[in-house]
Amino acid sequence: MVVVGVLALQGDWIEHIELLREIEGVEAVPVKTEKQLESIDALIIPGGESTTIGRLIERRGLLEPLRDRIRAGLPVLGTCAGSILLAKKVRDRVVGPVEQPLLAVMDIAVLRNAFGRQMNSFEAEVHIEGVGTVHAAFIRAPIIEETWGEARPIAKLNHPLLGEVTVAARQKAIIATVFHPEITGDSKLHKLLVAAAKGRAF
């Protein structure tokens, strides 16, 4: 049995739990404490409000424990706000540079709210390297502006206003997506995370 934790401080963590429970051989658990973090084989950082999630991570004393486990090789999937929290550099489309707590474990720069407001949300088919085509929901989504070091793009999207943009990246056992696969019920990335937790090629 593979234990996959979902950071459950704010955001749409319940949708991830429900999707994980449909995968055979997986126990899906909410993670709110350092003790719960210690017992998992993989982690999902869900969408939500990245500044709020970051502050709650700090308040609960989870910032360093999360960084330590991820740097030690814990497989991680960060979706939407999760990709922002994983990034080493973050700015906002409207206000520019922002000050917010970050895990800062991934060599990516993220632009918050890149597609505009909630009314500009949309769904699209996205081809992800090594995964296949995922039906993705973009809700006040960021984009990955830059990758360097050990991170590399694994999915791009042609947008009518922004042109070609990076919407997913990978660094070792970490995957960041700017979209929500859980909202559309697409479990391909979740199954990839489970495979990584089992020690299969990632």
UniProtKB/Swiss-Prot annotation:
Taxonomic source organism: Hyperthermus butylicus (strain DSM 5456 / JCM 9403 / PLM1-5)
Family: Belongs to the glutaminase PdxT/SNO family.
Annotated residues for binding of L-glutamine: 48-50, 112, 139-140
Encoding gene, per UniProt annotation: pdxT
Keywords assigned: Glutamine amidotransferase, Hydrolase, Lyase, Pyridoxal phosphate
Highest taxon in the source lineage: Archaea
Function: Catalyzes the hydrolysis of glutamine to glutamate and ammonia as part of the biosynthesis of pyridoxal 5'-phosphate. The resulting ammonia molecule is channeled to the active site of PdxS.
Protein name: Pyridoxal 5'-phosphate synthase subunit PdxT
Catalytic residues (UniProt): 80, 180, 182
Oligomeric and partner information: In the presence of PdxS, forms a dodecamer of heterodimers. Only shows activity in the heterodimer.
One Gene Ontology term of the molecular function aspect: glutaminase activity
PROSITE patterns cross-referenced by the UniProt entry: PDXT_SNO_1, PDXT_SNO_2
Catalytic reactions on record: aldehydo-D-ribose 5-phosphate + D-glyceraldehyde 3-phosphate + L-glutamine = pyridoxal 5'-phosphate + L-glutamate + phosphate + 3 H2O + H(+); L-glutamine + H2O = L-glutamate + NH4(+)
Keyword Lyase applies: yes
InterPro entries: Class_I_gatase-like, PdxT/SNO, PdxT/SNO_CS
